[in-house]
């Protein structure tokens, strides 16, 4: 049975049991800031388990794309060297949200495994949590599993609830006892049953974990019952496929074998058991699907994890002898294997291929640049007799140049040097602390709130007269009252304030009554349907239960709405002008501007920018109404509504028709396109490989920008004594004049260098038959210095020369050595001898080298020492 059939049978089985088939969520979690990547099927349902979100179904089944690389759940270093570790895997799961519990979950699992997949019952073992008598009795008395094949597992990890059979997604969140199902490969394979000293062997393989969600663990480790008992199960597709295909390694299943053969094809390797091929086959899945979900290789966060995975794959290609680009060519093979189950992969094939190809090409630049920095640091360390590379240097390589720490450590190891990793970790921690400090007010998520939801009125109203305070927080802790001057978060039962979401910033405004005034500087979501108003109490004492008038800053809201609506029109225009591949990759909409990141592989031309502006402003002039409808997600997408990157959508969505644009959006917008006033793009640039950024302004900001631009044009025209309409022609004339003068100046400098060279030649000192010259050439640039050195080498025949110039407090140095002398006297070493004394460094060829410095006061002494240095080399 092939992997695709196993996946389909799983989903169809649970659909027949009343479950709704739910599409896989993004690998970038939309509802959990504690997770780097989606690493299990339950991630998209976390808020449902917590009671913070409702769904129209109580039973669900999924085939969830998952990644474990980086953070707590990190399998990266094991991938390729074990039978079952992967960076990317598919988790088959069934879920109950307060519907069925342990009994049905266990019976469903047994029926699927033994009935649909026809696994022999005697091959299946199960484990339960030590204290879970209910699950034990269901397995033993109802399913009929013999007692010797049911194993109780207690707290075997050194703490209460720290057990292989007590599951938790992270340090906080939903958790509960679990029951695991194992497959016995038989006595010919070494290993013991779970809980035994030999459990790490390959005989007994876990294939399914049934988690019975009963608790929510908070940051202090406290367990509170979930509002409803729930079921979360997970079965790795790769593991069950290995069992059903009668192989002992996941890499031997049909899906992986196709990718391994493709990797072998691109690397010209015949041995399909080579571990490096397994690494490449695994990594193409993780990298491709991460890019599908909007992750781009970068130097931090998810982008850095992706970059590490890509480079690890390429590094293994090098080990196999492949020196050129190859990794991106495997995308087509992956699409052939998985594009049917995940059409989003097929749709993004061209983009994924391009991003991976660019990252491969940049790999060489990154490694070369990073190596040059590391070599310089190691040379400096060697000159001081040190054996430990400063962790700050390693951190700079990591943070600025995207240089993996493990690669730095490998290079150092070859030189007998270690990396000060504690110092590296300190630098990383310092950076994180700075990031936390910068986001002082961004503390809404994570507040311990269990009260009523907030009803949002902001689409229709800018004022709500009778809002009741349901919770108050100071420094993240719940309080009953706030006094004057305190910063706090206020939760209301009703609000017109829009909470930051979908790229749109939160509202600002005031909460007030006769004795209270609270200034709101930001609005963020505490939970999916709970709004936190962040700010400072300016007057009175605010208590839980108080009733206030909630009023937003209407002018700021209107400006933000103009920019948000313009973003929709711009997105549509970009797709028309640049192509349908344009997808939103991020946005920031505030009162001043809209910043829009999108997938595109080249800078926009001036003509393309003008065309986008023309299209958007035509829609503005059309003054079309904005029409909002609420409908099912699938219906909206089928109707042409655009779903955006990074957004988490429920089963019912808000669809906005605005002019020629139709998008899913929960933000605030203008009533008619004419309310935007004027649209103007003010910036276009690149932010990452394959990602462009546009900034635009609207309304009075756009009018002001155009007026200021017109004033600058008139001022420039006046300075050049021309009319504004003649400005381009006049600038061209001035540029031609400047070029002619620069050419004339260059000729004069060359002539001066020639005459100075003749004069300098007489200053050379004979040292053992070599003419040594070290001098300053006033007013010379680097080009003039180099030309003069070349002429002096020709004139002096056998020579070692250093020429210097000083301009703006900076020293320029050129060293030249004739061919007959360069075996003993190297130009690079000579120029470095001088450069080190003037606060710089340099390098170059044995016959010609260049350097710079920042301490011109030391230059005379440095040049005076050249004769002795050359003498020592001869």
UniProtKB/Swiss-Prot annotation:
<feature type="binding site">
    <location>
        <position position="564"/>
    </location>
    <ligand>
        <name>Zn(2+)</name>
    </ligand>
</feature>
<dbReference type="GO" id="GO:0005524">
    <property type="term" value="F:ATP binding"/>
</dbReference>
<comment type="similarity">
    <text>Belongs to the class-II aminoacyl-tRNA synthetase family.</text>
</comment>
<dbReference type="InterPro" id="IPR018165">
    <property type="entry name" value="Ala-tRNA-synth_IIc_core"/>
</dbReference>
<dbReference type="InterPro" id="IPR012947">
    <property type="entry name" value="tRNA_SAD"/>
</dbReference>
<keyword id="KW-0436">Ligase</keyword>
<dbReference type="GO" id="GO:0008270">
    <property type="term" value="F:zinc ion binding"/>
</dbReference>
<keyword id="KW-0479">Metal-binding</keyword>
<dbReference type="InterPro" id="IPR018162">
    <property type="entry name" value="Ala-tRNA-ligase_IIc_anticod-bd"/>
</dbReference>
<keyword id="KW-0963">Cytoplasm</keyword>
<dbReference type="GO" id="GO:0006419">
    <property type="term" value="P:alanyl-tRNA aminoacylation"/>
</dbReference>
<dbReference type="GO" id="GO:0002161">
    <property type="term" value="F:aminoacyl-tRNA deacylase activity"/>
</dbReference>
<dbReference type="GO" id="GO:0000049">
    <property type="term" value="F:tRNA binding"/>
</dbReference>
<dbReference type="InterPro" id="IPR002318">
    <property type="entry name" value="Ala-tRNA-lgiase_IIc"/>
</dbReference>
<keyword id="KW-0067">ATP-binding</keyword>
<dbReference type="InterPro" id="IPR050058">
    <property type="entry name" value="Ala-tRNA_ligase"/>
</dbReference>
<feature type="binding site">
    <location>
        <position position="669"/>
    </location>
    <ligand>
        <name>Zn(2+)</name>
    </ligand>
</feature>
<keyword id="KW-0694">RNA-binding</keyword>
<feature type="binding site">
    <location>
        <position position="665"/>
    </location>
    <ligand>
        <name>Zn(2+)</name>
    </ligand>
</feature>
<dbReference type="Pfam" id="PF07973">
    <property type="entry name" value="tRNA_SAD"/>
</dbReference>
<protein>
    <recommendedName>
        <fullName>Alanine--tRNA ligase</fullName>
        <ecNumber>6.1.1.7</ecNumber>
    </recommendedName>
</protein>
<keyword id="KW-0648">Protein biosynthesis</keyword>
<dbReference type="GO" id="GO:0004813">
    <property type="term" value="F:alanine-tRNA ligase activity"/>
</dbReference>
<dbReference type="InterPro" id="IPR009000">
    <property type="entry name" value="Transl_B-barrel_sf"/>
</dbReference>
<dbReference type="InterPro" id="IPR045864">
    <property type="entry name" value="aa-tRNA-synth_II/BPL/LPL"/>
</dbReference>
<dbReference type="InterPro" id="IPR018163">
    <property type="entry name" value="Thr/Ala-tRNA-synth_IIc_edit"/>
</dbReference>
<dbReference type="Pfam" id="PF01411">
    <property type="entry name" value="tRNA-synt_2c"/>
</dbReference>
<dbReference type="Pfam" id="PF02272">
    <property type="entry name" value="DHHA1"/>
</dbReference>
<comment type="function">
    <text>Catalyzes the attachment of alanine to tRNA(Ala) in a two-step reaction: alanine is first activated by ATP to form Ala-AMP and then transferred to the acceptor end of tRNA(Ala). Also edits incorrectly charged Ser-tRNA(Ala) and Gly-tRNA(Ala) via its editing domain.</text>
</comment>
<keyword id="KW-0030">Aminoacyl-tRNA synthetase</keyword>
<keyword id="KW-0862">Zinc</keyword>
<dbReference type="GO" id="GO:0005829">
    <property type="term" value="C:cytosol"/>
</dbReference>
<dbReference type="InterPro" id="IPR003156">
    <property type="entry name" value="DHHA1_dom"/>
</dbReference>
<dbReference type="InterPro" id="IPR018164">
    <property type="entry name" value="Ala-tRNA-synth_IIc_N"/>
</dbReference>
<keyword id="KW-0820">tRNA-binding</keyword>
<feature type="binding site">
    <location>
        <position position="568"/>
    </location>
    <ligand>
        <name>Zn(2+)</name>
    </ligand>
</feature>
<dbReference type="GO" id="GO:0045892">
    <property type="term" value="P:negative regulation of DNA-templated transcription"/>
</dbReference>
<dbReference type="InterPro" id="IPR023033">
    <property type="entry name" value="Ala_tRNA_ligase_euk/bac"/>
</dbReference>
<keyword id="KW-0547">Nucleotide-binding</keyword>
